[in-house]
Amino acid sequence: MNQEIFDKIKNIIVDQLDVDADSVSPESNFISDLDADSLDTVELVMAFEEEFDIDIPDDVAEKITTVGEAVNIIAEKTGAN
């Protein structure tokens, strides 16, 4: 897992969802662990796209359920595998 991407995503999640940084791990599920709702997840994906200057298609975004999945997709899109 790309630590730099994880750290950036973690900061975005902490800011957007107002959660404790210690509660965010690669295994964290956005909805069940971080109490995000569907609007929160859309806003997070938009923030990820802006931060990393990438486009995440809706069909891919809908499949992102954990922080680790988001890191992997962003790493793939940015070529930072």
From Swiss-Prot:
Describe the location of the Carrier domain by residue ranges: 3-78
PTM-bearing positions, type O-(pantetheine 4'-phosphoryl)serine: 38
Q: Which residues form a coiled coil?
A: none
Where does the protein end up? Cytoplasm
Looking up Gene3D superfamilies in the UniProt record yields: ACP-like
Query: What are the TM regions of this chain, as residue ranges?
Result: none
Keywords of the record, alphabetical order, are:
Cytoplasm, Fatty acid biosynthesis, Fatty acid metabolism, Lipid biosynthesis, Lipid metabolism, Phosphopantetheine, Phosphoprotein
* Principal place of residence: cytoplasm
Q: How is it modified after translation?
A: 4'-phosphopantetheine is transferred from CoA to a specific serine of apo-ACP by AcpS. This modification is essential for activity because fatty acids are bound in thioester linkage to the sulfhydryl of the prosthetic group.
Q: Name one GO molecular function term.
A: acyl binding
Q: Name one GO biological process term.
A: lipid A biosynthetic process
Instruction: Look up the record and name the pathway of this protein.
Output: Lipid metabolism; fatty acid biosynthesis
Q: What GO cellular component is one of the record's annotations?
A: membrane
Q: Where is the signal peptide?
A: none
Q: Briefly, what is this protein's role?
A: Carrier of the growing fatty acid chain in fatty acid biosynthesis.
Report the sequence similarity comment from the record. Answer: Belongs to the acyl carrier protein (ACP) family.
NCBIfam families in UniProt: acyl_carrier (TIGR00517), PRK00982.1-2 (NF002148), PRK00982.1-4 (NF002150), PRK00982.1-5 (NF002151)
HAMAP family xrefs: Acyl_carrier
Indicate what this protein is called per its UniProt record: Acyl carrier protein
| Organism this protein belongs to | Picosynechococcus sp. (strain ATCC 27264 / PCC 7002 / PR-6) (Agmenellum quadruplicatum)
